[in-house]
Amino acid sequence: EQCGDDVCGAGHCCSEYPPMHCKRVGQLYDLCMASKATKNSGNHLFFCPCDEGMYCDMNSWSCQKRTA
């Protein structure tokens, strides 16, 4: 799926969902960014969990290794 300027795939940590999806998932709502954080799609960015020891780099929209 398109996410920001990138496509959500292997190693990536975000994808776009409509605002109603964010509301439906309830407890995951806090993982959905405000719609203004996306392009002009009106969708919210939803951040998938990264592997252990990784974090989501919102600049590159990818999972990066944590540095000590």
From Swiss-Prot:
- Cellular localization per UniProt: Secreted
| UniProt-listed InterPro entries | Atracotoxin (IPR020202)
Q: One GO CC annotation, please?
A: extracellular region
Query: Which intervals of the chain form a coiled coil?
Result: none
Protein's UniProt name? U1-hexatoxin-Hv1a
A Pfam family cross-referenced in the UniProt record is: MIT_LIKE_ACTX
Name the source organism.
Hadronyche versuta
- Where is this chain primarily localised? secreted
Tissue localization of expression: Expressed by the venom gland.
